[in-house]
């Protein structure tokens, strides 16, 4: 069941989302060759706690960290670690903050120093996919209008769209309805209504969209071990159009 939020509830979610946005604003200039994802983890957790919020993923279904840190061929749910990032890497940092019982969720892919033209194109197209999806997130449209725009743009640029990891509604729970992949057909899927709050988070791959899960039960990698990128915002549907609650 899709839970529609009041304006008051949307503002409460926005406060949690802005904690997450501050994490990303703070870390962006710090991501350079030599930094570790453990260090990024500490920066994010410190900011979340400073605001009186909680790092929601820490302890979620046994997950042990405040962030997911996904490097190069890791699509999502990578663990922070002590290995320094290297020139040419790309890294996606995803975090969820809980503030006063409401959740905010955002992921962003960062370049580590100078990256390859392929990685640059992948990051650019993935961000464009996010923007195209948001543009279709209007009351009266359907989820398929968003996802088809994302899929068409990614595939027309020669990239894959991950099917097995989903975007989701969000509020007091992390995974509310609708849960949906970033592929589809225009005019299909649930109708978008004012008061809906959900993520748009395309995961785009250099090669195949197919993936594997590491033995740790979490880390999702591209099957062909080529690069993956992701950009995620939490948005609210209003009479005026989509509002980006995690705007940085």
Where are these regions (language model features)?
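Active-site neighborhoods and metal-handling regions in enzymes and metal-associated proteins
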Residues: 1-248
């Amino acid at each position: 069941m899709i839970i529609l939020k009041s304006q008051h509830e949307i503002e409460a979610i926005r406060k949690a989302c802005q904690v997450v946005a501050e994490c990303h604003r703070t870390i962006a200039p710090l991501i350079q060759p030599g930094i570790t994802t453990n260090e990024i983890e500490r920066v994010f957790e410190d900011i979340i706690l400073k605001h009186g919020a909680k790092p929601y993923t820490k302890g979620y279904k046994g997950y042990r960290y405040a962030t997911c840190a996904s490097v190069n061929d890791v699509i999502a749910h990578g663990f922070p670690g002590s290995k320094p990032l290297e020139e040419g890497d790309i890294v996606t940092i995803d975090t969820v903050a809980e503030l006063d019982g409401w959740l905010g969720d955002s992921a962003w892919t960062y370049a580590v120093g100078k990256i390859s033209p392929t990685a640059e194109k992948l990051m650019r197209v993935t961000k464009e996919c996010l923007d195209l999806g948001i543009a279709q997130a209007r009351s009266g449209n359907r989820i398929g209008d968003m996802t088809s725009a994302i899929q068409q743009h990614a595939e027309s640029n020669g990239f894959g769209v991950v099917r097995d990891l989903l975007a989701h509604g969000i509020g007091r729970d992390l995974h509310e309805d609708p849960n949906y992949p970033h592929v589809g057909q225009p005019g299909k899927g649930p109708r978008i209504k004012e008061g809906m709050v959900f993520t748009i988070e395309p995961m785009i791959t250099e090669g195949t969209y197919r993936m594997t899960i590491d033995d740790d039960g979490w880390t999702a990698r591209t099957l062909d071990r080529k690069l993956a990128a992701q950009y995620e915002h939490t948005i609210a549907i209003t009479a005026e159009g989509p509002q980006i609650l995690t705007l940085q």
